[in-house]
């Protein structure tokens, strides 16, 4: 077994607060696969049950906010997480419950993936919840990982270029978050540009675009990968770099399932030594 793989196989724990995806490609299912494949231990608090497949979302069944709080605190009081990944938060009541639970468990490494629209176009959060996320939750997390449409919604700013991405990331910093990773897959071009920004640094990660429709759950996967690397003690920027490499490999080896936007291959990380090259 490669030495670098041994380094990753720590006893770190990642708590995932997100919605369930019945197709298995995104949401809490993708998160668990990612954390487990990268060698850490996944804990969960489910915020909603979504009925969906690769062609779209059929319905969303919300979980009682009180039970979301109980899931987070009861699990964390027994097994303390080293990092938290937050995904789908569809209402103000859910966000308030999550904020209350985060105040209770006091974990530093919190990654927020502001899930707003499913790959097929279905809206996954209401407008009041977006405003609460911007005004309160964003200040409590270590980093946020929006894609371009999500970053546009959060800042009321259109993104057409890499420079626009940087400016929008800086606007998000002004909202109170310390680190921003904007995913650039929605911009056209031979390469995908993911941009990391904090108060002192700007880093552009360039990846050759994989021509495929099978990208369901890439955002969930990236944020969970970043949270996992953070849980192992890696710096934020390095965690972003390794997370992007992991997702890129998972897209390249996708199994081509389903009639729509198919899932990626989370277990490609069994060849995880490639990520460190």
Regions found by a protein language model. Name each.
Residues 11, 62, 237-277:
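Charged C-terminal helix
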Residues 29-34, 153, 212-236:
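Short, small-residue alpha-helix embedded
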Residues 127-202:
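Conserved phosphate/ATP/ADP-binding segment of small-molecule kinases
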Residues 24-40:
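N-terminal basic/disordered segments at the start of proteins
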Residues 38-43, 203, 229-243:
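Phosphate-handling active-site elements
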């Amino acid at each position: 077994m490669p030495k670098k793989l041994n380094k990753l196989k720590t006893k770190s724990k990642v708590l995932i607060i997100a919605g369930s995806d019945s197709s298995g490609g995104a949401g809490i299912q993708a998160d668990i696969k990612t954390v487990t494949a990268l060698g850490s231990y996944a804990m969960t608090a489910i915020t909603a049950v979504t009925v969906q497949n690769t062609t779209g979302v059929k319905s969303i069944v919300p979980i009682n906010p009180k039970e979301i709080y109980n899931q987070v605190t009861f699990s964390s009081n027994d097994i303390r997480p080293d990092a938290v990944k937050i995904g789908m938060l569809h209402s103000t009541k859910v966000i308030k419950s999550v904020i209350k639970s985060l105040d209770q468990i006091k974990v530093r490494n919190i990654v927020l993936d502001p899930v707003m629209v499913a790959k097929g176009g279905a809206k996954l959060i209401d407008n009041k919840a977006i405003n609460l996320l911007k005004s309160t939750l964003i200040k409590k997390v270590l980093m946020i990982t929006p894609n371009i449409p999500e970053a546009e919604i959060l800042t009321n700013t259109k993104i057409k270029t890499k420079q626009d991405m940087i400016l929008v990331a800086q606007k998000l910093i002004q909202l109170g978050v310390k680190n921003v990773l904007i995913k650039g897959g929605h911009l056209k071009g031979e390469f995908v540009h993911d941009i990391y920004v904090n108060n002192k640094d700007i880093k552009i990660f360039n990846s050759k675009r994989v021509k495929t429709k099978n990208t369901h759950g890439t955002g969930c996967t990236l944020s969970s990968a970043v949270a996992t690397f953070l849980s192992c003690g890696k710096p934020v920027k390095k965690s972003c770099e390794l997370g992007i490499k992991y997702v890129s490999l998972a897209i390249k080896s996708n199994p081509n399932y389903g009639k729509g936007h198919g899932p990626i291959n989370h277990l490609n990380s069994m060849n995880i030594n490639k990520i460190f090259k």
